[in-house]
Amino acid sequence: MKQIKSFKIYIVVLCLLGSASCSDLLDQEPISITHPDVFWDSQANAEQAVAGAYSLFKEAIITQSNFLYWGEWTGMTFMNSRNWIVNYIEGSGNYVLAYRDASMNWKNFYRAANWAYTIEQYIEDMPVDMFDSQTEKDRLLGEAAFIRSLTYFYMARIWGDVPIVEQSIESSDQLISEDGYIVENARVDELQVLDYALEAANKSIGLLQYSTPGASNWAITANKASAEALKAHISLWYAGRDNDNPEMIQQAIDATTSVINNSGASLIDYVNEGKEGFDEMCIGQSKTGLFEINISADMNESFRLLQYDDNHTGLTLNYPVWQSVNTGISPYMDPDFYGNEMMATDADRANDVRKDLFFYEYGTNADYSYLQKYSHSTQDEASEDAYAQFSESNILIFRLADMYLLRAEANARKELSGPAISDLNEIRSKANVPDYTGGTDRESLMKAIFDERAIEFVGEAQSGYDRIRMDYYDGVPWVNQARNAKKGYFWPVLPSVISRNPSILQTEYWRGKL
């Protein structure tokens, strides 16, 4: 059962690097800045502050369903969206989306990162006797460091080079130099951003403890395994962006192995657990979760299911969740899309149980089949309308299957086919897919791992990032060498960000296209 308290806290609204004017630099002056001796005086207030950081990160990724635009639609694996805005991406690889400026704006990420950094600075100075124990103080510091790391990692995957802000922005005075000029923060090389994120992840690992499935905050707040999962992702992304950096590959192997051995999490056996196991995974806080965005009506952390294109349920669901078939927004399982073609032509996939668990009527009617990972809901008791439903599906960020397949990829990069295939087969076995018998060369293994990740994490906004990290673009017709040479796989920076901070340079591919 989901059991996290919902907190509200007025926090710094960081407009440095964002789109706000100087006059509204601080949307609301926070009590933590105005009266630090009053606010930072108890564990309860520190807990409230950390809850605010989680909330800011949640806002950054779910605003206008941006997490799907960044990590799912760009992957082009299973769902062909009927939505005209998504078609900018699917049709021509155009990331300059109509009515979706937020997808190019990193403002919300910096709000989350700056607040997390601020929390770290203040909690560090709080005496231990303000907390129940040193362990509790460390936990809160570790969770704040985790959010800061996760936020910068997301920005690195979306934009590549981004500014690093290593100070708590508490006053507009901090944005003015001694000479009276506005302080400008230029974009920093992607690998430096990853180093910064990795440093914060390691800090988090050192401060947090492992948790246990069934614990009240399991998977919806960070524990040591959450931070190790984040480190695994950062390290392998780093390796993929730095010519198979051997140190980073090994760090990814070590981090994934630690999660697998120590997290207490276990895989969902789709064959034996069936729909019950699938539902538990999607609703959240299941035995396989490592970190998730909490969606719960009981704790005022939900929203009504609506057939609109500004939320992830509207963009992924269809009848009978909706009262009638939606042919204007909902996606369909295009047989020509990479993942659907793979499932249809690979004989090993004939009895893959995920086709029936993950999708509604997969293979029966491609036009009306849809992903079911965001279909879980509860009735709005205040309404007599049977279709007045609150979402109850968590957004899964890290889970245990991810660790097995990341480790498989890391070993494939080292050309260690044995352990790579072993981890690949562990995931296949849970879905009634026979052991892998294909080629053992790196290229063959990387394709097999990408394919497994494509079906296992469909809808979880992984495939777009997987393509960049693995440099694998089969099935994406608008990707070419010339585009990639100019880093066209990254998203453009919103022009208003650049106009307010001239030291920010647009990504080469997008120059002249906005």
Stretches found by the model and what they are:
Residues 156-157, 163, 212, 237-244, ...:
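Short coil/turn linking the two alpha-helices of tandem helical-hairpin repeats
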Residues 47-51, 55-56, 83-159, 183-195, ...:
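Conserved, well-structured interaction surfaces
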Residues 10-19:
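Bacterial N-terminal signal peptides
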Residues 353-427:
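C-terminal substrate/ligand-recognition segments
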Residues 21-22, 54, 62, 66, ...:
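Long, intrinsically disordered, low-complexity segments
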Residues 23-86, 166, 194, 198-205, ...:
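An aromatic- and glycine-enriched ligand-binding surface/loop that stacks and positions planar moieties
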